[in-house]
Amino acid sequence: MGTQETILNVVTNANNNSSEPTVKKTTVEMFLPHDVTFILLRLVNKGYAAYVVGGCVRDTICNQLFETNYPIHDYDITTDATPKQIMEVFNAYKIIPTGLKHGTVTVLLNNKTYEITTYRKESDYSDHRHADKIEFVGTLKEDLSRRDLTINAIAYNPLEGFVDPFNGMLDIYNKTIRCVGNPNERLQEDALRILRVVRFASTRGFTIEEETRKAICNPDNYKWLKHISRERITDELRKMLKVNPCLIDTSEKVDDLIGMLHCDYLDMFNTILPGFYLMYDYTSSYSNYTFMLGHNLATLFNLRREFSSDYSFSTCMVALFHDVGKHFAKRIYDDYTGADDFPNLGEKSVELFRRSVLPCLRLSNKEIKEIELLILHYDDIIVCNKQFITEKLLELGSLEAFKQLYQLQVADYLDNLYSSNPKEHLTYLENSYKLACELVNNKEVCFQIKDLNISGDDIIELLNLEPGPVFCEILKKLLDEVNLGNLKNTKEELTKYILDNFNEK
C-alpha cells in the first residue's frame, strides 16, 4: 500500500467574536492499492512522472475529512509519458489500446484494468460535449487546468504527496464547488458539467461558488444542454436523486435546496425537463410552499429523508411530477365562491408526463409503467382493513407498488399544511403497509397462479387430469377464491376445495 501524509492548513474564523482568522491543521493520508503503487513507481523508475488523479483523490480526502464512505472503484493515472512510452514500460503486461487517440492506454494487472493517460489539453468543443482537438502537454499543471472542478484537479503520488495547484483541497474542506479557471469556458466546453456541479452540491451538501453559480444560470451556457443525449441526462439525474440522507436532515437544509432549485436553476432544469414550467406558477393552498413545484420538491426531499436509500428512481420521478397535469384538470364547481377541484388529475398528469418529460429521458419500460401507475393512484385513499388492502394490492399488481405508493403518501403528507393529527395519520399509513406485507408474506393475497400453495402437478394427481381448459379454469377459480377471502391459501384447504368442486369434471 502506498501512503503519504499531508498537512492541510485551513484558514478559519475559529472564534465568532473575533474577526482574526486562525489556521487549522488537518492531516490527510492517501492509501493506494498495491497494483496502483506498482504502476506509479514503475513509470517513475523509468524516468517519467506519474500520479493518480480525479475522483479517487477527491473521495479519499472527503472520506477522511467528513467521515463519509464514498466507494473508490477506479484509480485514474496521469503521466508525462506518451502512449507509445507507456506501452514500452508495460510491454510485459496485457495492454488494451482502445483509447490511444485520446492518449489513454489500459493495462491489465491481476485481472483488473487501469487507465493511464498522457498529460493533455483539449480544445474546440464543437458539440459542447467532446473535444475535437487533443494535444499532449509537458506539465501536470497544464493537464489539471483542463479539468472541470478544483476538487477534481488534485493529483497524488507516494513520493511527492498531493499536488494541488488550484486549491481543491481547501475547497473540499470548505465544501465549495468551484470551476477550474473561467467557469463559463469550462461549462461551454462540456454542458453536462452543469448537471455535475448541481449533483455534487445536492448530493454532498456542498455550496456552489458564486461565479460558478452565475455561469450555471447563464442561458448562453445551459442552452447547450439540449445537445446532450437523453442517456447522459438520465444518468446524471439518477445520480442526483441518490443522496446521503444526513445531508438533508433539517428543514432548513430542505428549504435551502428547494429555494436553490426553484429560484436559481429552474430555467436550466426546464431546458432538459420542460415539465418543470407546468408547475412553476401554479399555487398550492395545502402545502408549506405557496407554489406547486415547491410542494413537489418538498415531497421529493421528504421521500429521500424518511426512507434513506430504500426508494426507487421511479418513486422520485413521481414525487416530482405527480401534479404536472393540475393546470389542465382544474374545474370550478362553484362560480360564486370560486371553489375548484381536479377530476381526472391522475390521467391528465400521466398525459403531460408522457408529452413533456418522457421524451427527454431514457427510461426502461418497467420504470415507465411504474411511474404512470403511481401517478394514477397517487391520491388514492388508503383504508386499513384486510378487504380494502387486498383489493388495492391486486389493483396495483405487486407489494412493491404498494410500498412505493405508501412512501409517496407519507412524503406528501409531511408537507401538508393542514395536518391536524400528523403522527396519527402517518401511523395509520404505516399500519396499512404492514398489513399489506403480512397479507402477501402469508400468501393471503396471490398476484399470480404461481403464488398458490398448490402446483399443477398436484391437481393432475388429485383429479387424474390432463392439462387443458378445465385445468386452467380450476387454477383461476382457486386464485379468485383466495383473493376474495373465501379460501385460505394452504395446500390442505385448496386440496379440499378441488375435491369438493371439481372431482367430477
Predicted regions and their residues:
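Catalytic cores of the polymerase beta-like nucleotidyltransferase superfamily
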Residues: 1-505
